[in-house]
Amino acid sequence: MSLKINVRESGNVVILDLIGRITIGEEAASLRDTIKEHLDSGQKNILLNLAEVSYIDSTGLGQFVGSFATVTSRGGQLKLLNLQKKLQELMQITKLITVFETYTNETAAVRSFAGAATAG
């Protein structure tokens, strides 16, 4: 199963609903390209909804880190929503859980961007 990306907006936050697998090849490239398109159009607050991600490999994790660095360097924020149990464990093992803000509630995640915007 390839990666499908549904794009929604909530206020000034772009929510990317990811469905499928994030692996080496087209899937990781598609995620990178989608994030870059939104950054290029001035949308800097990005929330990745991972509720329906069935599998992620090391390339997928690397894509998260690369995207985080790109978004941050352009004055934005990238946050994660609805990590599945296996991904949550993987993020803890790799210590990436300390890099990303993660949420289980979409409303709280979207509101967290508003707090950051007023602080900057």
Enumerate the predicted regions with their spans.
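Acidic phosphotransfer microenvironment of two-component signaling modules
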Residues: K85, T107-A108
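Non-catalytic signal-transmission and effector/linker regions of two-component phosphorelay proteins
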Residues: M1-E9, A114-G120
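STAS-typified acidic loop motif
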Residues: I5-D33
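Exposed loop/turn and edge beta-strand positions of beta-sandwich/beta-sheet ligand-binding modules
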Residues: M1, N12, Q77
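Amphipathic alpha-helical interaction surfaces in cytosolic regulatory modules
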Residues: I22-F100
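Short acidic-hydrophobic, aromatic-tinged amphipathic segments that line or gate anion-handling sites
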Residues: E101-N105
